[in-house]
């Protein structure tokens, strides 16, 4: 797990909320505090659909327009937390050249990204959850490095905190 302090908040938020750089991820949870608190869970409500959806998880690209609409205006949110889970496609994109991609495919841990904005500071935090206990940290270290490299490839200034 690493924490990346983002120095270019506006640019980072554009990549998160406007561009498609994280669209392949699944939403775990989002909380935004403006004049009132908005909370969004990443589980799909099957009763809302006429036909059962193929996936019970919600992709970030489905939720971000709602979040963006909620926060746009003259005032920035007091607080915002967005937790994403990497999809298989996103994990492949970031880990395919890491040397641990085959191990990732065997173990299939949950790879997480959390974006936290509070008190005019934005941080990205990586995370990983294994189905079984392991002392092997290779996937975790590769995920941390891949996320840091990905953020830098987007042209966003970040430093480990």
Predicted regions and their residues:
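Short, surface-exposed, charged/polar-biased interaction segments
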Residues: 30, 34, 39, 43, ...
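Generic structural motif
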Residues: 9, 38, 43, 85-91, ...
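Surface-exposed, low-hydrophobicity interaction/linker segments
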Residues: 55-121
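Charge-rich, low-complexity N-terminal segments
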Residues: 1-62
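Mixed-charge, glycine-accented linear interaction segment located at domain edges/termini
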Residues: 122-161
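Generic "edge-of-domain/loop-turn" microfeature
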Residues: 23, 27, 31-32, 89-91, ...
